[in-house]
């Protein structure tokens, strides 16, 4: 996305208000001239560097529900500002896309988010790598089409998946000091429900360690104020799939990746061992902001945003302590981050509409701020 | 003095390697000072340089060992090697097999592959040593960035070629 970085003094000379900058969601630090230009208004205070983004997931159905969430996110971003979005996987149901020209690029991405004019950074989910409706995750080639779409001539340019796993910093302007570093993880090969886990074609035994090594190294080297990992699969969840290591109750009969134990191991050795700030994920089709748990450094906060289209009831709503959680309703999260605060708002749709007050202002169902 | 000098010269090639590490179904000699973990993510062995003394190596160099059962009525070393190549390519892009060498290690047949591929944001080179251990295949893989790999080829190759079968234990999970 080409974003406007116009010095405030220039805007003042042009007679434009500084409010324009915040309305477009710009997050770059702004320098003011030390000597005011004669005849110009008094300098506006230096803007605090700020990043705003939305998180949504499990969305890719190309149906009325997805379109409604897309419209609600566009409405909210217009009112409050968004620099970019993150999508927590299962971007295309039930079995991913088969090329960079698959019709689902239009029906389940470009059209539902046509009014959302910001970059979207997606993670891959089990349905993105699947050959069957259960989303077994046995066809990584389909996920690779999603990587390829990033540079495809047919793309609107919003889709940003340069690799199956990667990192980026925000503000997105390379010149700005990073406030947040995002680590986009590929959880599916470590949590797939494969028909034959012993089949070496799907073997995660090398991919797991190399991804772990990359994540640990990148996390260790991060200079950002806040660190956020996002993936499709949870570490903990009160939704139908449950916690990693016992996904869908498979922990009693552990075979290969089905119970998600390899994915849990990756998180334990990296995010949990090294004190990640936030893990945002999907897989379960609801909204949760879960409290830190002792098994993961008692600091990392877990945010589930998987209500981007069709939704489900909780599996066990008391499995993990939550600050707030909502099932059976479409929704998404909006975040505003500064050097000292990380605020998240859970927006739950009512009758497939963004909830607003009498003045037309968005009404989040839940808000939480974490400070440093 | 002359005797000590001779002894030092004789021991020099060995000094780059630590004692033989014995795992579940395999043994291997790791490069000196490398630290190892067993069983994380179901991987029998993961090893790399220590973070405290070699942060760059910790972030780039990685050795893994896997032990996989084989039905020898159906699978030979050549067939298993093809499956391994397919597995690496499955998770990678820009995948290239640079070399495939047949080896014999203490009477057991093995294949040494040299690979180059992209995984996630990284370009990697790898030695993959596949050893026929009777009813199972052992695989030692060492990966690093191309630059570090070229610089450490001898050390990496010695490590993977030290892979040997050992007795197996019962499955943990």
List where the protein language model places each region.
Chain A
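Bacterial N-terminal signal peptides that target proteins for export
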Residues: 1-12
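C-terminal motif of bacterial Sec signal peptides marking the signal peptidase cleavage site
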Residues: 20-23
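Bacterial signal peptide processing site
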Residues: 25-27
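N-terminal active-site segment of His-dependent metallophosphoesterases
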Residues: 32-103
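Structured segments of extracytoplasmic/periplasmic soluble domains
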Residues: 56-62, 72-79, 108, 112-115, ...
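Active-site glycine-centered loops adjacent to acidic/histidine catalytic or metal-binding residues
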Residues: 58, 89-90, 125-126, 185, ...
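Extended active-site neighborhood of metal-dependent phosphoesterases/phosphodiesterases
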Residues: 93-227, 241-262, 266-267, 275-278, ...
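A short C-terminal boundary segment appended to hydrolase-like catalytic domains
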Residues: 322-372
